[in-house]
Each structure stands twice: as C-alpha cells, then as structure tokens.
C-alpha cells in the first residue's frame, strides 16, 4: 500500500492507505514494467479491498482493541501537497493510527519487556488477537502490524502493562485459487501465505508471523488457560456477530459474496478449537523461555507423573524473591526440550528433577549466575561465557559449554517449521536424449543452533528416455553432529542400464563414427556408490570433507552385445578381460573447495578452487587398487565496467594403481572439452584449460523475459596420458555463441563448438564455471 500519516487539529494521528496495491517494491528494478509486475498486480486482487470494515464487529465481540476504518474516495485537497498525485481521486482507507491513545511500536515494547521484568503485557489478550487473525485469515501479522498500549500510562504505576492492538488488515479474507498459487506456491514456496478457505488447513503457518513473543515468560500459558480462552472466544462469535460483520461491507460486496464469506467464517470459527489445540501442542514440543535482564530466580522440579514444573520469580534490589513471573508444568508426553535463556541479571537456578525425561538447556550470559543442582535425571546442557558462576550440589550433572564468544549465549529462537519440497529435474544431451527426474527433499529445522538447518535429506529418481537408464540419488546432511563437523551421506545408484561412452584408454583413442556409429561406444553397466563424510566449514569460503566410500559394479554382457566394451583388445585397461565380472571397492575420499567469487551467477572477480581425492581398494579377485587426485582453479576478471568478463579454468588430475575402465580420468564433452563426445578420452593423467569471454551487449527491458544479452567465445584445450597409449597431441575445441541471463537469476547459453571431430551444439542452463 501507499501510506500517508496525517495529523488532525487535536494532534491525533491518522493513517491514509491506498486500497489499490503498488507492487514495485516487491520486485527488482529490472522487472518493473514487465509481465512479472502485472502478475503481482493481478495477484493483489486476491486481497479483499474492504476487509478492514468487517473487523470492528468481530473484535468488539471477542474483546480485541481495533481501529475504526472508513473507506472512500480521496477528494482533491491542497493540504495533500506533493502527495496529491498519489492519493487524489483514488479509493483509500482512513483510520486512527493509535485507537486507544499513545502507544509503542513492537520493537520498543519488546525491548521494554526484555529490559525490565516489572513491565509486562496481557498474554490472553494477545492470544485473542491472534485467534481473530486466524478467523479472517490475516496471515501477515509481523511485528510492524502491532501497537502496544500501556494500560498504566495514566496512573501512578510506573510499570508498563501492555495491551496488544493489531492493525493493518491488508491480508484478511485473501483468496488463493488455482493450481500454481494454491497447490504449488502456497503449499511449497510460501506456506505462510494462507488463504481464506473453509476450515483451517495449516494453523502452524497461519500464526507464523506473530510468533515473536512465544518465548516470553508471561506467554507460557497452561493448557487449561489456553483452552478456556479458546472456548470463550468461539462462544462469543455467534452467527449474528458473523452476520453483522459481513453486513459491514458495501452492499455491492454483500451481493457478490456476502453469503460465501459468512459460511466461510462459520467454518473457520467451528474449526478453531481443534486448530488451536494443534498449535498449542506444536509450540510446546520444544520450548524457549527468554528471561529479562533483571534478577530472577528459576525453580525447576519434576512432578510425580514425570512432568517438569518451571517457576520464575522476580528478585528485587535487596535480593528478596517477590512476585511470580511464570509458573507452568510441562508434560513429558508433549514437551521434549526446554531452552532457558537467562540474559543479563544476577539469576539463580534451582534444579530438583528426579524423574522427568524432558531435556533441559540453560543459556547463561556474561553476568555470573548461581546454579543449585539438587538432582537431575539427565545431564543439563549449560552454555556460558563467564567462569565466575557458582555451582552448588551435584555439579557433575552439568555439561558445560564455555566460550567467551557472545554467540555462545545469544538468544536464537527455535525454528519448529520442518519442511518438505517436491523436486523436478529435466535435461537433454546427445547421448541420453531427454531426461526427467522426480524426487522430494525434507528439511528438519528444530536442532539447537543448527544453521541453515538441522538436517536435510533428499531423494531423486531420474530416467533417460533414449537409453532407458535410471539414476537414483540420495543425499543427507546433518549439521554440527561431531563437534563442529557435519555428517554428509551421499548414495548414488546409476541403475538399471546406466550408459556411459567409452572409446578405450589413451590420448589417441579412435572414434570410428562412420564405420560403427556413436551407439557402438556406449557401455551399459550399473554402478552403486555409498559415501559418508565428515565436513568442516572453517570459514564462510572454505569447505573440507573426508570419509569412507564403497562402490559396486555390474555389467550384463547381453546388454552390450556388438559394442566396443566387449572388445578386450581395444580397451587397454587392466580389467579388459574381466569387464563382465562384478567388482567391489572400498576407500577414502576427500574434497576441498574455496569460493571467493563476488557472486554465484556470472561472477566478475574472484577465485573458485576445488580438489578431490578418491582411493579404491579392491574387495574381490577382480578388483584392483587405485587412487585418483583431481582439481581445478577458476579465475574471473573483467574490463570496461564488467562489459567483458573473462573466466579461465585450469584443471587436471592423476590416477595411480590399476583403475577399472570407468575409474580413469575423462576428457570430453560439455564439462571440460567441448567439440568432442562425452567421456571422449580416458587416461591416467589429464590436464585441460577452458577460457571463456562473455561480452555484454544489452540490458533487455523485455515485458516477458527481461535480462542481460551477450555474446560469448570459448576455447578449450586438453590431453590425457596413458602408459603405452600416448602421443603429444593436445585436443582443441573453439566456438562461440550467445547467452542470456534472465532477471539476473537464470543463465541460458547456446554455443557451437568445432574440433577435428566436427561441430557440436550445446545448450544449457547455467555457465560451465
């Protein structure tokens, strides 16, 4: 919305907001005036233009403070001054900015609550306001859409007692329809954007934006308090209240969808108890409790039924315990972990947990604390950056994580929102034809200080239609499992009917295309790899990983009849006579990457360094030992204010021992030597150099696909070495083409490359390097 703050003669402030939304701020400048902006403009029509008018009737019924909006056409008025072109003769909403009087914004209110435990807010009023958001599907309730009125500001009581006031009802009654927006975008891309539908399909995301006070002690409502508030809220929303709310809309809106809105409100009201029960269970699975910067006493004790009671009290300046700040019992069947953040006060924590299995983490601060551990069923994980704290009782039940870095005690809210995402891959090349892959990725977020996730697992299955080959790929990543090291597990099955070119070992291997055709050199075999690793990230630009791996090989001779791979005299590999025998290997692999590029897409400066080591130890009589070391260094630099970008990559590797035919180093194709078939040359050593020049021609202000258009030239050179099958010739490919980077996000390029073996076209998304 375009907003303007107004002041009337009494000094009271009003907010004037356009009903029609402006989408320029939502997209990059290069997308302004394109179909993307038109799509967003059309999407804003999903918002009901008059939804704010419905709120007062509902809010009055459930005791939620509210503004008193009116909607009309802004008349011509000189008082608008320079803003007149934005507002005159437009439909706009006008409402008081602070309905109850002077109030604080959310950052100030949250800061006051953190600084002083004498300042508080009304958690049940906050719960009612959030339930009203759910009723009308107002999902965008971030911090800036709340005001906080101090109920004590006109009294002699200096302590603040905040009443939450929701405002800006832009997203209420939003309708999401269609396969892309409802079934794809809302489900997987942005599930927070909930629509005004019958029932409440995803309460966890309906309340996502307003979760910023979940960790406050006052917000730790018991289940009894929670359900009572929900029950009272629903009982007050009678059909007559809902009908009155609908009839607050203009007559044209009532005639168009009044009955539908009424029935949807009924459905959502009736679904609230079950939805809020689900949300209560959701937020109480792993609980944050964030105490203030003043002095507090925390008493944690188990109950007879293995629950865990947490009581927090204020400690005054004289060191005496005064008022209670929270007192809640967490059931072990529901709550798995409590994370207690102590902040800056001179706090004391007394633990008397004889039976509860609930995991307890305590995060201290630079201020010394006092810990009294009478008993604890399990180890207490304590994080501190001071060594001055006092430990009494069974201190051995504490597992201390000490670090002077302030990050060790920083408040990091738990992320409860695990996600899964469907995956789709597609591609085309001359050997495999069109390929298609489907899969899914699951991301688990709930770990303590695990970023960017706790663990992630993904599985894809792809097939190449020309060859009938399949590829099944699994990858799992667990963050900071062994100290600072991540665990990564990669499993790849190129089966059944994996296809790979093989022309024999040597720099002078023949490709008799006219005599045999390309299919003759395609080998069908199955490969299975399992590779667990430990990965370290010592800096933002450096990654290092190492771990064991296992590999299995199988080739069916009936699927390779009349093909090159069954011609042992031409293969020149140690396994030429055992190609059809199953093989198994185990070994160690390691990789290192260092990335100092200034950006990921078409970088103009920086280096990208990668290196990999793979060892293979044979596990049966047909499997021999070998090891492979490979790497590459890519440099980027530019001229004429990035009008020309040069990218140069030099790479190579060596193999020692007795590799199988597919374990050699390969040169050829899109990856490192254009102008030749994939896997064209196999050798024990390899070196190559790729250089590309990308010349920017024009920034295209296209309506449909804006982006950067340019020409590119490339030159590839390389060779392999193989004992007994070598020559001094370097293979070369030279070519050029065009590129187009769509919206600075998706590079596309088409090049034609010539070598001694002919012309080869290449089209792909993304640059090679």
Language-model segments: what does each one mean?
Residues 424, 438, 457-461, 487-491, ...:
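Membrane-embedded beta-strand positions of outer-membrane beta-barrel proteins
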Residues 428-432, 442-444, 461-467, 480, ...:
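Transmembrane beta-strands of outer-membrane beta-barrel pores
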Residues 589-590, 738, 758-769:
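Outer-membrane beta-barrel "beta-signal"
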Residues 415-416, 473, 502-504, 513-521, ...:
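C-terminal outer-membrane beta-barrel translocator/porin domains of Gram-negative envelope proteins
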Residues 177, 351-352, 363-482, 577-604, ...:
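Outer-membrane beta-barrel initiation region
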Residues 1-110, 137-138, 160-207, 329-330:
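Conserved ATP-binding subdomain of kinase catalytic cores across diverse folds
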Residues 44-45, 150-327, 332-339, 345, ...:
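C-terminal catalytic region of ATP-dependent kinase domains
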Residues 445-450, 482-487, 540-544, 554, ...:
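Repeated loop/turn-to-beta-strand initiation elements of outer-membrane beta-barrel proteins
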């Amino acid at each position: 919305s375009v907003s303007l703050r107004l002041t009337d003669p009494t000094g009271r402030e009003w907010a004037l907001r356009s009903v029609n939304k402006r989408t320029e701020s939502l997209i990059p400048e290069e997308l302004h005036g394109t179909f993307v902006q038109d799509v967003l403009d059309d999407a804003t029509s999903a918002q009901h233009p008059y939804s704010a008018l419905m709120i007062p009737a509902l809010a009055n019924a459930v005791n939620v403070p509210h503004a008193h909006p009116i909607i009309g056409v802004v008349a011509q008025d000189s008082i608008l001054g320079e803003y007149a072109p934005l507002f005159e003769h437009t439909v706009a909403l006008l409402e008081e900015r602070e309905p109850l009087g002077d109030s604080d914004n959310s950052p100030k209110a949250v800061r006051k609550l953190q600084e002083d435990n004498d300042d508080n807010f009304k958690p049940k009023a906050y719960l009612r306001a959030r339930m009203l958001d759910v009723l009308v599907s107002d999902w965008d309730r971030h911090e800036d859409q709340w005001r906080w009125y101090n109920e004590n500001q006109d009294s002699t009581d200096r302590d603040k007692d905040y009443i939450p006031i929701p405002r800006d009802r832009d997203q209420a009654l939003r309708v999401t329809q269609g396969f892309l927006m409802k079934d794809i975008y809302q489900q997987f891309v942005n599930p927070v954007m909930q629509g005004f539908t019958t029932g409440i399909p995803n309460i966890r995301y309906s309340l996502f934006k307003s979760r910023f006070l979940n960790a406050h002690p006052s917000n730790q409502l018991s289940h009894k308090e929670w359900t009572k508030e929900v029950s009272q809220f629903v009982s007050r929303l009678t059909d007559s209240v809902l009908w009155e709310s609908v009839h607050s809309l203009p007559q044209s809106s009532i005639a168009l969808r009044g009955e539908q809105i009424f029935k949807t409100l009924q459905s959502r009201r009736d679904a609230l108890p079950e939805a809020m029960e689900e949300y209560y269970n959701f937020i109480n699975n792993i609980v944050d409790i964030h105490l203030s910067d003043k002095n507090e006493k925390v008493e944690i004790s188990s109950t007879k039924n293995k629950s865990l009671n947490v009581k927090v009290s204020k400690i005054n300046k004289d060191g005496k315990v005064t008022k209670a700040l929270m007192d809640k019992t967490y059931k072990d069947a529901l709550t798995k972990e409590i994370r207690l953040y102590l902040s800056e006060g001179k706090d004391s924590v007394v633990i008397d947990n004889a039976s509860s299995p609930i995991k307890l983490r305590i995060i201290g601060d630079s201020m010394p604390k006092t810990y009294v551990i009478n008993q604890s069923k399990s180890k207490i994980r304590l994080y501190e950056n001071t060594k001055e704290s006092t430990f009494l009782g069974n201190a051995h039940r504490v597992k201390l994580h000490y670090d002077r870095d302030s990050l060790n005690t920083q408040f990091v809210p738990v992320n409860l929102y695990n996600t899964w995402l469907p995956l789709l891959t597609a591609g085309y090349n001359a050997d495999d034809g069109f390929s298609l892959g489907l899969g899914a990725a699951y991301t688990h977020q709930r770990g303590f200080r695990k970023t960017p996730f706790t663990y992630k697992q993904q599985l894809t299955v792809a097939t190449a239609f020309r060859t009938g080959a399949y590829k099944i790929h699994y990858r799992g990543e667990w963050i900071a499992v062994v100290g600072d090291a991540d665990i990564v597990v990669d499993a790849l099955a190129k089966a059944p009917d994996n296809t790979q070119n093989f022309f024999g070992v040597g720099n002078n291997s023949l490709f008799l295309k006219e005599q045999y055709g390309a299919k003759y050199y395609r080998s069908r075999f199955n490969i299975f790899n399992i590779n667990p690793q430990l990965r370290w990230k010592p800096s933002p630009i450096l990654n290092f990983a190492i771990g064991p791996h296992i590999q299995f090989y199988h080739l069916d001779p009936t699927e390779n009849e009349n093909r090159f791979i069954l011609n042992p005299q031409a293969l020149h590999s140690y396994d030429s006579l055992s190609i059809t025998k199953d093989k198994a290997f185990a070994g160690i692999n390691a990789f290192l990457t260092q990335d100092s590029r200034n950006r990921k897409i078409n970088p103009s400066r920086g280096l990208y360094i990668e290196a990999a080591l793979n060892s293979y130890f044979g596990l049966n009589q047909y499997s021999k030992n070998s090891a492979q070391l490979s790497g590459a260094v890519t440099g980027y630099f530019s001229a004429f204010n990035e009008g020309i970008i040069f990218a140069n990559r030099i790479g190579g590797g060596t193999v020692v021992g007795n590799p199988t035919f597919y374990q050699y180093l390969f040169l050829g194709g899109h990856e490192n030597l254009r102008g030749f078939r994939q896997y064209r040359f196999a050798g024990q050593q390899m070196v190559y150099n790729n250089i590309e020049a990308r010349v920017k021609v024009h920034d295209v202000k296209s309506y449909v696909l804006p982006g950067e258009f340019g020409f590119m030239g490339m030159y590839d050179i390389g060779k392999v070495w193989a004992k007994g099958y070598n020559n001094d010739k370097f293979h070369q490919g030279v070519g050029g083409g065009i590129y187009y980077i769509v919206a600075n996000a998706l590079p596309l390029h088409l090049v034609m490359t010539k070598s001694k073996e002919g012309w080869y076209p290449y089209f792909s998304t993304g640059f090679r390097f």
